[in-house]
C-alpha cells in the first residue's frame, strides 16, 4: 500500500504488477463454495453443454465490478458510503443500505456453511478420526471451531497486508490443486474412463439452453463475482491505496490524468483476477461434467464426497491431494470473506450511527474487533444450525436478490456520478448494460423461484 500522497500510476508492467492485489483477494474469496459445490452440480446435471454459460457468468459481471471500483477510486468512498448516496427513501441510511443489511445476514449464514464445509473436508481426510463426540462436539464441528480461531488469528490486526499475502498463497495453492485434478483425468490410466475430449469442449460451445434451467441460473448468482464480492472489491482498492494515490477529487487536467492512470491499474487488477477465477471455475465445472454427469444420487449435500470418491482409483495420495485442494479453496474463502465482511460491518455500524469513532485509531480498533467477531459468529451459526450446504444456499439466494440493485447502482454511477473525463467508452458502456441486464435477470429469477 502507498504511504505517501498523490502519485502517478505506473505504466510499465513491473510497476503495475507491484500494485495488483485487491483482485487476488477477491479471487481467493470467489473460488469457494459456489465453485466447489454449485459449479460441479451444473456439470453433473447438464454435462458439458453449459461450458459457455459458466465462462460467460464469470466474465460478464466484471464490468459492474470495475464500475463500482471506478466510483470508489475517483470519489474516495467505500461501497456502503457510495450506496448511501443513492436517491430514494431513507431511515437513518439509504434504502439500498438496508437491502445490503439483509444480504449481510444471509452471508453470515453462508460463511457458517463454508466453515462447516472446511470441517467436513478435514473430517473426510481421516487425520483426526479418534477425536470428536456427539451433538455439537462432532469432529467436523470441532474442526470448524479451530478454523474460526485460526481465521481470527490471521485477521485480528485488521491490516491489509496479511490478507493480501494469505490470498496470494491460497490462489497459488488452489490453482496447483485444480490443475492436478484436471491433469489426472487426462493422463492417469486409472481415470481414463473420465478423460475430457475435444468433442466434449466443442459441445460446451454450441450455445444451447436446457429445458429446465433452474440449477444453472441459480449457479450464475454464485459463480464468478457475486453480489458480495462486488461490494467487497472497492474496499480493497481503497486499502491498497488507489484512491490515496489519486488524491482529493480536483477537476483539473492533472488530477483527471492521474485518476485515469490508477483506473487503468484497477482494470488490469480486475481482469487478471477474472482470468484466474474463470479458469478455476471452468475446471470445477469440467470435473463435475466428466465425473458425475449421468450418475444417480448426486446432490449438493454430497458433492465434495462424490467428487473425492471418483479419485479413489488414484489411491490414497490422489484422494488426499484432492481433499487438500478442497480444504484450501474453502479456507481461503472463509478468511478473505471474513476480512471483507468485517470491513463492511465496521462501516455499517458507523453509517447506522451505532458506533462513532473519533479518530483513525478508534476506527482501526473497531475494524479489529469486527475481524474477531465475524469468524466467531459464523462458527456459532454452524455449531447450532449445521446443514452447511443449506446455509451456503441461503447466502447465495440473498446475494442473487441483491444483484439487480447493484447492477442499477453501477449504471447510476456511470451516468450520474462519474465526471465526463473519467467515463468509460461507448463499447464498455454497452457491455455494462449487458452485464447489468443479465444480473438483474438472475436476481428476478431467484425471487420468482422463491415465491413459487
Question: Residue spans of the language-model regions?
Answer:
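Membrane-interface "cap" regions at the ends of multi-pass membrane proteins
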Residues: 1-35, 94, 242, 260-272
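Extracellular loop-to-transmembrane helix junctions
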Residues: 14, 43-66, 92-95
